[in-house]
């Protein structure tokens, strides 16, 4: 296990060209566990959260429920859009958070450190479905966290975080001081980022992880490095997404759901269909023929398909998918 964790940490350090002083942390539980860990161990008093979909709203929900934190500041945008983090640097928060890619809607938001942040405000980026397939300069984030089951073609149940020196200092301070604006702050050992850091630097985890998950993750990272690194992966997702959105714009009954081209994700594409076409029936036909998981996010409730375009997906597969959809449309015309 230590050898596998070491391969993962070394590979991520190279893939993301980590600046001096950054550390790779990991632990069990996936991104959901990390939201709770960050709530308990990084946010001192109040968080500022950009909320624009099912998953970007969950961190805000976690900090709102914490009895030892002040209510978060939440900047919202409707589904299919996103707030601009560069203009959202309100005062009064010691962390600002947003999702690099909102998985439910296919909206991506670049990682850039907002100007005018209060001194000591940390930038936390949820890259659960964006890491490995979207461009990023890690120095623009204090914590860039994700899980293996999207861009890294592994299984879930594990979280990984690339943490800056400022974030590491905050973790130590919160653990030592236990700041509170209400009830006493309790940090369960399972959610302790101090414990996660201590174990990660020894190439291990606090709880034994699934070895298969680590093996697939390490192997995928090394494949990424052998095929052009992060730039090579972004080239693949760009090719896939350019084809998908170009196809949708050219179609008579299809439209990219995200109206702003700059916010259309390179890794999760959402395509709306005209009311004359039942997108659910198309997804069912695809599934019956072995092409699975093109259904939209269930809570969005739109007549659309959602297409994964992570680095492991060959761009030619996206081209084949749109050809299959065209065939279904022709047969039902």
Label every PLM stretch briefly.
Residues 152-238, 242-245:
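Active-site C-terminal subdomain of aminotransferase-like
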Residues 77-132, 143, 151:
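Active-site phosphate-binding strand-loop segment of PLP-dependent enzymes
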Residues 33-94:
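PLP-dependent aminotransferase-like
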Residues 255-285:
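Conserved PLP-binding catalytic core of the aspartate aminotransferase-like
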Residues 138-149, 159:
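Conserved active-site segment immediately N-terminal to the catalytic lysine
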Residues 1-37, 61-62:
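Conserved N-terminal alpha-helix of the aminotransferase class I/II PLP-enzyme fold
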């Amino acid at each position: 296990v230590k050898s596998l964790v070491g391969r993962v940490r070394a590979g991520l350090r190279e893939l993301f060209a980590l600046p001096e002083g950054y550390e790779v942390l990991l632990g069990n539980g996936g991104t959901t566990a990390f939201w709770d860990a960050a709530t308990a161990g990084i946010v001192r008093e109040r968080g500022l959260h950009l909320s624009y979909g099912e998953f970007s709203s969950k961190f805000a929900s976690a900090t709102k429920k914490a009895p030892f934190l002040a209510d978060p500041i939440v900047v919202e945008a409707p589904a299919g859009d996103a707030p601009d983090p560069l203009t959202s640097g309100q005062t009064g928060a010691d962390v600002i958070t947003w999702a690099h890619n909102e998985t439910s809607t296919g909206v991506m938001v670049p990682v850039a450190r907002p100007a005018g942040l209060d001194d000591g405000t940390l930038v936390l980026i949820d890259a659960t479905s964006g890491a490995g397939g979207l461009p990023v300069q890690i120095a623009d984030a204090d914590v860039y966290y994700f899980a293996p089951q999207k861009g890294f073609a592994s299984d879930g149940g594990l979280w990984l975080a690339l943490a800056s020196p400022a974030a590491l200092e905050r973790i130590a301070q919160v653990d030592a001081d236990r700041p509170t604006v209400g009830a006493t702050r309790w940090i369960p050992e399972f959610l302790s980022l101090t414990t996660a850091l201590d174990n990660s630097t020894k190439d291990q985890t606090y709880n034994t992880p699934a070895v298969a998950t680590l093996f697939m993750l390490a192997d995928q990272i090394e494949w990424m490095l052998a095929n052009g690194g992060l730039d090579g992966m972004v080239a693949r997702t760009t090719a896939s997404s350019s084809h998908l959105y170009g196809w949708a714009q050219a179609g008579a009954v299809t439209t990219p759901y995200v109206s702003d081209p700059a916010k259309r994700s390179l890794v999760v594409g959402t395509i709306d269909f005209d009311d004359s076409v039942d997108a659910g029936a198309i997804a069912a036909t695809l599934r019956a023929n072995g092409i699975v998981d093109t259904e939209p996010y269930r809570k969005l409730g739109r007549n659309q398909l959602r297409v994964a375009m992570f680095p492991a997906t060959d761009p030619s597969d996206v081209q084949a998918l749109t050809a299959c959809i065209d065939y279904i449309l022709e047969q039902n015309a």
